[in-house]
Amino acid sequence: MAESLRSPRRSLYKLVGSPPWKEAFRQRCLERMRNSRDRLLNRYRQAGSSGPGNSQNSFLVQEVMEEEWNALQSVENCPEDLAQLEELIDMAVLEEIQQELINQEQSIISEYEKSLQFDEKCLSIMLAEWEANPLICPVCTKYNLRITSGVVVCQCGLSIPSHSSELTEQKLRACLEGSINEHSAHCPHTPEFSVTGGTEEKSSLLMSCLACDTWAVIL
């Protein structure tokens, strides 16, 4: 960011030296970073293990500071001679704001990683329970699924006619686990299960995930 502020058009990168303007720039940068959470996490996911490892290669900090600087210069109450002041912004102040943004960026990523770890733990527990116990209903996650006369039923009210007369609890378990594992191969979030359909059409068991915007018919 410091290098970008030393471009040939030096006059475009000068701030009023009073504390209010410095604080306004700082607050607006922090607010823009908070509002750019989705953009930041998308870049983080795309980068994977090859992502930035230091402040010079942060995901979004420099871009946020440059965007906010341009926005600050365009406000109506900005002094007309703002771009003509001889005093450049103090580099120490700039670096302080930059470091604060880097800390905020890392905090957002850390919170996201903790969320992923929690989802992975929940998924592991779910799969372990399915393997060790009778088949748990994926919709209510409380009661056991049963297959009676070709219909998959649960105490929670779930009732889905099977598409195959040969469906067993073992086959249904394998189908559920396979679908969850296939989803987890490309998305770390825990999917949700629901029943679709009504009286006129046959009910189906649906697996969906809001995080990656995917869905699949399980049964």
Swiss-Prot record:
Keywords: Cytoplasm, Isopeptide bond, Metal-binding, Nucleus, Phosphoprotein, Ubl conjugation, Zinc, Zinc-finger. Changing residue 114 to R: Abolishes sumoylation. Widely expressed. Expressed in pancreas, kidney, muscle, liver, lung, placenta, brain, heart, leukocytes, colon, intestine, ovary, testis, prostate, thymus and spleen. GO terms for cellular component: cytoplasm; fibrillar center; nucleoplasm; nucleus; PML body. A zinc finger (RIP-type) spans 137-212. It comes from the Eukaryota. Residues 164-180 are annotated as: Mediates nuclear export. The keyword Cytoplasm applies. The modification Phosphoserine is found at residue 18. Changing residue 121 to R: Induces a strong decrease in sumoylation. Abolishes sumoylation. The keyword rRNA-binding does not apply. There is a cross-link at residue 121 (Glycyl lysine isopeptide (Lys-Gly) (interchain with G-Cter in SUMO)). GO terms for molecular function: zinc ion binding. GO terms for biological process: protein import into nucleus; response to UV. Mediates the import of RPA complex into the nucleus, possibly via some interaction with importin beta. Isoform 2 is sumoylated and mediates the localization of RPA complex into the PML body of the nucleus, thereby participating in RPA function in DNA metabolism. Interacts with the RPA1 subunit of RPA complex. This is RPA-interacting protein.
